[in-house]
Amino acid sequence: MSDIVRFGVSLDNTLLKQFDRFIKDRNYTNRSEAIRDLIRQELLKKEWTEDQEVAGAITYIYDHHQRDLLNKIIDIQHDFHDVIKSTQHIHLDHDNCLEIVAVKGNPTTISKLSNALKAIKGVRHGSLSISGVGQIA
């Protein structure tokens, strides 16, 4: 017996047309998979607001010539060693580096780490990509 449950959804025709364009743009094969992904996305956001264990990646680009920048990055990473699982350093060109920090733990702590790294003088861009730890179906 399947665990799949079918249910009906009533939508305004204009909203349905917009949703169908969204499905086409994202290459979904059907509405059901798009709805499942949207539900998962909202449940994931909820995990991040309820202090459940989460995972994610912090990415940032910085000018490695910036005075004392690397020491500040290392100090911050050591301050948050309990949530950092891995880091990857990539040389983009002569001046710019990309760093990817894989994280797992408390969402508040991870957000503080992300904000601290992005606030360092010389960091040109940074973002936090959120995910869960596999609890959402």
Curated annotation (Swiss-Prot):
InterPro entries in alphabetical order: Acetolactate_synth/TF_NikR_C, ACT-like_dom_sf, Arc_rbn_hlx_hlx, CopG, CopG/NikR_regulator, Ni_resp_reg_NikR, Ribbon_hlx_hlx, TF_NikR_Ni-bd_C
GO MF term list: DNA binding; DNA-binding transcription factor activity; nickel cation binding
GO BP of this protein: response to nickel cation
Family annotation (SUPFAM superfamilies): ACT-like, Ribbon-helix-helix
Binding site for Ni(2+): 78, 89, 91, 97
Residue spans crossing the bilayer: none
Cofactors (names): Ni(2+)
CDD domains: RHH_NikR_HicB-like
Textual note on the cofactor: Binds 1 nickel ion per subunit.
Keywords: DNA-binding, Metal-binding, Nickel, Transcription, Transcription regulation
Job description of the protein: Transcriptional regulator.
Protein family: Belongs to the transcriptional regulatory CopG/NikR family.
Protein's name according to its UniProt entry: Putative nickel-responsive regulator
UniProt source species: Syntrophus aciditrophicus (strain SB)
